[in-house]
Design a protein with these regions (language model features):
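Rossmann-fold NAD(P)-binding glycine/threonine-rich loop
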Residues: 79-89
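Short beta->alpha connector loops at strand-helix junctions that form conserved
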Residues: 32, 74-75, 91-102, 177
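N-terminal glycine-/charge-rich "phosphate-binding" loop or analogous flexible N-terminal tail
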Residues: 1-48
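Phosphate-coordination loops involved in phosphoryl transfer and adenosine-cofactor binding
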Residues: 2, 68, 146-149
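Phosphate-binding beta-alpha-beta segment of Rossmann-like dinucleotide-binding domains, i.e.
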Residues: 97-149, 175
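Short, conserved loop/helix-junction motifs that constitute active-site signature segments
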Residues: 22, 62-67
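Rossmann-like dinucleotide/phosphate-binding beta-alpha-beta segment
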Residues: 23, 138-191
Length: 191
């Protein structure tokens, strides 16, 4: 049985060129990007296919060779892969559930702070040369987030990181999750 691994769109994973794929064994073939036709050609005889945000439809999966046993999505989301079609073909799909948890949570908090401070409106004023918002009286409203209530849907890795940062900002937390815990530590579970 082939142990070959094919990374079909490494460019999506290595956008900052920090990864050194050259240290991988000869059993791992790495391609910067692949069209669907190239992908099918390149994975012939492969056991594992590694992708990053590449659409893998039922139609594309129907062309996969029988040697493929595993598709690895090199990120958290795997909605780009037709899971039912993969299952029918006997291909396991896995992802990296804790990948960039902090970055995603920080982006959520950044958006909250952006809206609370009407940052986009203020930037727009500055771009036009309007500095009236920075005089004695603010022309654009600003809302403090401390004491405000944040609703979080899902208390997985990302949700819990959002909660941690929001609590540090003094926010009250309501959480809806499939696996609620007892209220406490500044968190109230709701349904």
């Amino acid at each position: 049985m082939s142990e070959r691994v094919v990374v079909v769109n490494a460019g999506k994973m290595n956008y900052d060129h920090a990864l050194d794929f050259s240290i991988l064994s000869n059993d791992v073939q790495v391609y910067e990007d692949s069209t669907n036709a190239e992908l099918i050609e390149r994975i012939q005889g492969a056991r594992v296919v590694v992708t990053k945000e590449l659409p893998v439809s039922a139609e594309l999966l129907s062309q996969f060779p029988d040697t493929v046993e595993l598709i690895v999505e090199a990120g958290t989301g795997y909605n780009n892969i037709d899971l039912d079609a993969a299952k029918k073909k006997g291909i396991t799909v896995c992802n990296i559930p804790a990948y960039s948890t902090e970055r995603v949570a920080h982006t959520v908090i950044m958006m909250i702070l952006n809206f609370a401070s009407t940052m986009q409106q203020q930037i727009g004023m500055l771009v036009k040369g309007d500095r009236s918002n920075f005089t004695k009286y603010l022309q654009v409203s600003h809302t403090e987030v401390n004491g405000k209530t944040l609703g979080v849907v899902g208390a997985g890795h990302i949700g819990m990181e959002v909660i941690k940062v929001a609590k540090a900002l003094g926010m009250n937390i309501l959480v809806h999750t499939r696996t609620p815990k007892a209220d406490g530590d500044g968190i109230r579970y709701v349904s």
